[in-house]
């Protein structure tokens, strides 16, 4: 009796191959879509002056850093920009912090402004850590009076930094739970980016969440979910009526700055 050596077709195996191929294809698509959504450098619209310095990364890339000191005992804000924001666009907010007596620092991601290279999630984390350590080492900043303020994608950078360093305060403005969940309404696709909700339990400092009620890019539900994820209950939350994704500080005005002052200093005045 001869045995048929041909393999028996297994529909289940074929189905699994199709499913795996579909997941891989969708993961690649999601990654590309997310990258295009996250990183949109604007044209350079300003000239560097003595307020700007360069911090050199390990691979030789010069990070364009802004620093203005207010005094040794002042609180320091390290501002992490949004996806379409260079230092010139962030300057009104930075100047407001200066007027309120803060040391102010920020930097441009790779591919933004006067920083060369191309941005990705990994090098944003590494570069932010370099600037953070530079402030402690070269500017004499104390972590006990250091505030991380991240807007939009910068909130993801600030959250990661707060898990690996020990800042005194964390402010997240217009920030998402994760990129895939916000952009694609999916959490199961592998390779998600800026998974802030999953990192919340690792943040040990007080947190202030700020969100515009009319944000059509990152819905305010993201900040509501983040509030529930931070442990210990040391979380403040400000929603700004009629504010969208990019104008929360302008629409919020006095209420916005009062909330920040109360959160950082315990002061009752935003002026």
Predicted features and spans:
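Alpha/beta-hydrolase fold nucleophile elbow
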Residues: 140-152
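Acidic catalytic loop of the alpha/beta-hydrolase fold
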Residues: 214-218, 246-247
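Short alpha-helix in the alpha/beta-hydrolase fold that links the catalytic acid
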Residues: 93, 196, 205, 219-228, ...
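An N-terminal hydrophobic leader/cap segment in hydrolases
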Residues: 11-57, 64
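Membrane-embedded segments
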Residues: 62-134, 156
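C-terminal catalytic histidine-bearing segment of alpha/beta-hydrolase fold enzymes
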Residues: 224-225, 232-271
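Short beta-strand/loop motif that positions the catalytic acidic residue
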Residues: 203-204, 209-211, 215
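Active-site nucleophile loop of the alpha/beta-hydrolase fold
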Residues: 167, 171-181
């Amino acid at each position: 009796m001869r045995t048929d050596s041909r393999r028996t077709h297994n529909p289940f195996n074929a189905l699994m191959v199709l499913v795996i191929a579909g997941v891989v294809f969708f993961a690649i698509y999601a990654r590309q879509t997310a990258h295009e959504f996250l990183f949109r450098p604007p044209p350079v619209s300003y000239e560097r002056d003595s307020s700007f310095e360069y911090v050199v990364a390990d691979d030789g890339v010069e990070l364009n850093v802004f620093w203005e000191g207010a005094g040794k005992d002042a609180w320091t804000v390290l501002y992490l920009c949004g996806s379409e924001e260079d230092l010139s666009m962030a300057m009104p907010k930075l100047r407001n912090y200066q007027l309120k007596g803060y040391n102010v620092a920020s930097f441009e991601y790779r591919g933004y402004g006067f920083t060369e290279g191309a941005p990705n999630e990994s090098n944003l984390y590494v570069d932010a850590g370099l600037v953070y350590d530079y402030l402690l080492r070269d500017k004499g900043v104390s972590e006990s009076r250091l505030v991380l303020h991240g807007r939009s994608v910068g909130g993801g950078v600030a959250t990661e930094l707060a898990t690996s360093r020990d800042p005194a305060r964390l402010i997240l403005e217009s920030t998402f739970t994760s990129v895939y969940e916000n952009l694609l309404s999916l959490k199961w696709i592998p390779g998600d980016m800026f998974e802030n909700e999953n990192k919340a339990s690792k943040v040990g400092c007080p947190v202030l969440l700020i969100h515009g009620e009319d944000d059509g890019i990152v819905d305010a539900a993201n900040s509501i979910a983040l509030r529930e994820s931070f442990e210990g209950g040391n979380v403040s939350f400000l929603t700004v009526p009629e504010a969208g994704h990019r104008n929360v500080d302008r629409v919020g005005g006095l209420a916005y700055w009062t909330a920040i002052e109360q959160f950082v200093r315990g002061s009752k005045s935003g002026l």
